[in-house]
């Protein structure tokens, strides 16, 4: 991570950390680095946003910065992050920009860039933008007079994106009753329209954004709200999106949460059956549940683990030409159709599996037995040296032997704080908690901040 760019673009409290001044500079310098094409006088840039009240303020500043460098800007309005990624590639734009802080609270906002291929930026591209941000007055082009171009609105872009999502399945969803939760964010209008157009009967919550209520008690980070709705309305299942629509968490007809691991397994199983799963491989992160790997093994499907973060999943998928990957948190990447996690796309694919198999979502999800998980954070003096400590290693080996293949240990440093996360999965809740505590106690004793 750089000085400005985190794992998913530039984020901060809007108007305090992510100010209009910074948004202007990101537009100007980001536009120069990513869209400045010697052969094209006015590179095309697409800009979308979620429903946060600060979005319009940052959008105006960002667009001003882009126009100041000579870009021709098309404003997409409220749309999902994967919608921007898809349209950038589909419309041969030089650059796509999304203004959103995803599942974060309303006070936060963020700016993330997509290259002309629809993928997020490389580290080198981010470093180049950061270098310009740190310069006082970089000598960059400044068009004047009739060289300055108007920006235009292309709100029809959302419909173009939805038509594409609809085309990725060969079945209508008539006969299915689906509860939808738009997190009062980017998918609030998109999701009901899409699933209605596919002839599903829909129940809707979290689709009344007012600029302030994004992710508030709804969406993929609060699936309990949708679970209640699914049970009360006797829906076949529910789909909960996050604020910018790049994640999906589902709920079965009984109100049970179906997470990203289970969704990947269900879709991957169907793809493998139809011989559509490249190299019979699914890419996930180290945080995926042990039950996920055991279920894949039973199906003869291979798995590949990356560091936590959807950008690492996408990197691995591109490297190996794999077409399914994702995270337990609900970022699912279906590379045949889009370049980034896409909640609406994943929801449509999952619904199609339910329709085509004739099975309930609970039946499909039950094929993957989730192992109970316990997570303990320990503040330490050296977060990167914990797994090299002999006492910690010995305790991990002891617990590993005790679990006898019916569990998993993961001890990893936090990306942002001076702590390590001790995660244990075991056959029962009690065992997971007990084993995690035993390891955490040794970490605390040998390397804790207070010792």
From Swiss-Prot:
<dbReference type="InterPro" id="IPR005846">
    <property type="entry name" value="A-D-PHexomutase_a/b/a-III"/>
</dbReference>
<dbReference type="GO" id="GO:0009252">
    <property type="term" value="P:peptidoglycan biosynthetic process"/>
</dbReference>
<dbReference type="InterPro" id="IPR036900">
    <property type="entry name" value="A-D-PHexomutase_C_sf"/>
</dbReference>
<dbReference type="GO" id="GO:0006048">
    <property type="term" value="P:UDP-N-acetylglucosamine biosynthetic process"/>
</dbReference>
<dbReference type="Pfam" id="PF02879">
    <property type="entry name" value="PGM_PMM_II"/>
</dbReference>
<keyword id="KW-0597">Phosphoprotein</keyword>
<feature type="binding site">
    <location>
        <position position="246"/>
    </location>
    <ligand>
        <name>Mg(2+)</name>
    </ligand>
</feature>
<keyword id="KW-0460">Magnesium</keyword>
<dbReference type="InterPro" id="IPR005845">
    <property type="entry name" value="A-D-PHexomutase_a/b/a-II"/>
</dbReference>
<dbReference type="InterPro" id="IPR005843">
    <property type="entry name" value="A-D-PHexomutase_C"/>
</dbReference>
<feature type="modified residue" description="Phosphoserine">
    <location>
        <position position="102"/>
    </location>
</feature>
<dbReference type="Pfam" id="PF02880">
    <property type="entry name" value="PGM_PMM_III"/>
</dbReference>
<dbReference type="Pfam" id="PF00408">
    <property type="entry name" value="PGM_PMM_IV"/>
</dbReference>
<dbReference type="InterPro" id="IPR005841">
    <property type="entry name" value="Alpha-D-phosphohexomutase_SF"/>
</dbReference>
<feature type="binding site" description="via phosphate group">
    <location>
        <position position="102"/>
    </location>
    <ligand>
        <name>Mg(2+)</name>
    </ligand>
</feature>
<dbReference type="InterPro" id="IPR016055">
    <property type="entry name" value="A-D-PHexomutase_a/b/a-I/II/III"/>
</dbReference>
<dbReference type="GO" id="GO:0000287">
    <property type="term" value="F:magnesium ion binding"/>
</dbReference>
<dbReference type="InterPro" id="IPR005844">
    <property type="entry name" value="A-D-PHexomutase_a/b/a-I"/>
</dbReference>
<feature type="binding site">
    <location>
        <position position="244"/>
    </location>
    <ligand>
        <name>Mg(2+)</name>
    </ligand>
</feature>
<dbReference type="InterPro" id="IPR016066">
    <property type="entry name" value="A-D-PHexomutase_CS"/>
</dbReference>
<keyword id="KW-0413">Isomerase</keyword>
<dbReference type="GO" id="GO:0004615">
    <property type="term" value="F:phosphomannomutase activity"/>
</dbReference>
<dbReference type="InterPro" id="IPR006352">
    <property type="entry name" value="GlmM_bact"/>
</dbReference>
<comment type="similarity">
    <text>Belongs to the phosphohexose mutase family.</text>
</comment>
<dbReference type="GO" id="GO:0008966">
    <property type="term" value="F:phosphoglucosamine mutase activity"/>
</dbReference>
<protein>
    <recommendedName>
        <fullName>Phosphoglucosamine mutase</fullName>
        <ecNumber>5.4.2.10</ecNumber>
    </recommendedName>
</protein>
<feature type="binding site">
    <location>
        <position position="242"/>
    </location>
    <ligand>
        <name>Mg(2+)</name>
    </ligand>
</feature>
<dbReference type="GO" id="GO:0005829">
    <property type="term" value="C:cytosol"/>
</dbReference>
<dbReference type="Pfam" id="PF02878">
    <property type="entry name" value="PGM_PMM_I"/>
</dbReference>
<dbReference type="InterPro" id="IPR050060">
    <property type="entry name" value="Phosphoglucosamine_mutase"/>
</dbReference>
<comment type="function">
    <text>Catalyzes the conversion of glucosamine-6-phosphate to glucosamine-1-phosphate.</text>
</comment>
<keyword id="KW-0479">Metal-binding</keyword>
<feature type="active site" description="Phosphoserine intermediate">
    <location>
        <position position="102"/>
    </location>
</feature>
<dbReference type="GO" id="GO:0005975">
    <property type="term" value="P:carbohydrate metabolic process"/>
</dbReference>
């Amino acid at each position: 991570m750089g000085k400005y760019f985190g794992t998913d673009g530039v984020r901060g409290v809007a108007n305090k950390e992510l100010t209009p001044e910074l948004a202007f500079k990101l537009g100007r310098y980001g536009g120069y680095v990513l869209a400045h094409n010697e052969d094209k006088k006015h590179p095309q840039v697409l800009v979308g946003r979620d429903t946060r009240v600060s979005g319009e303020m940052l959008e105006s500043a960002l667009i001003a910065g882009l126009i100041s460098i000579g870009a021709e800007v098309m404003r997409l309005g409220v749309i999902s992050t994967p919608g921007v990624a898809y349209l950038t590639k589909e419309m041969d734009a030089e650059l796509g920009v999304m203004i959103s802080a995803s599942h974060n609270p309303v006070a936060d906002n963020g700016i993330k860039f997509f290259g002309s291929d629809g993928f997020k930026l490389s580290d080198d591209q981010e470093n180049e933008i950061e270098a310009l941000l740190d310069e006082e007055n970089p000598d960059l082009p400044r068009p004047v007079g009739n060289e300055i171009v108007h920006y235009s609105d292309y709100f029809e872009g959302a419909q173009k994106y939805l038509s594409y999502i609809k085309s990725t399945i060969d079945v209508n969803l008539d006969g299915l009753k689906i509860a939808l939760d738009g997190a009062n964010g980017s998918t609030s209008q998109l999701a009901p329209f899409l699933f209605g157009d596919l002839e599903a009967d829909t129940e809707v919550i979290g689709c009344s954004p007012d600029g302030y209520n994004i992710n508030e008690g709804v969406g993929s980070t609060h699936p309990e709200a949708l679970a209640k709705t699914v049970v009360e309305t006797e829906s076949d299942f529910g789909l909960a999106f996050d604020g910018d629509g790049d994640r999906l968490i589902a709920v079965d007809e009984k109100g049970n949460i179906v997470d990203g691991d289970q969704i990947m397994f269900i879709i991957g199983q169907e793809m493998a059956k139809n011989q559509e799963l490249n190299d019979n491989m699914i890419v996930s992160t180290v945080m995926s549940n042990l039950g996920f790997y055991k279920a894949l093994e039973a199906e003869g499907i291979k798995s590949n683990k990356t560091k936590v973060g959807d950008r690492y999943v996408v990197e691995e998928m591109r490297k190996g030409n794999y077409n399914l990957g994702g995270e337990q948190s609900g970022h699912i990447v279906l590379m045949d159709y889009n370049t980034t996690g896409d909640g609406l796309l994943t929801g449509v694919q999952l619904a199609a599996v339910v329709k085509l198999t004739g099975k309930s979502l609970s039946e499909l999800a039950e094929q993957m037995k989730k192992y109970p998980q316990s997570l303990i954070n320990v503040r330490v003096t050296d977060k990167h040296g914990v797994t090299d400590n002999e006492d910690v290693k010995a305790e991990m080996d002891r617990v590993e032997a005790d679990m006898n293949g019916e569990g998993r240990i993961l001890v990893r440093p936090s990306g942002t704080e001076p702590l390590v996360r001790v995660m244990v999965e075991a056959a029962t809740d009690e065992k997971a908690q007990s084993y995690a505590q035993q390891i955490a106690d040794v970490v605390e004793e040998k390397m804790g901040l207070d010792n």
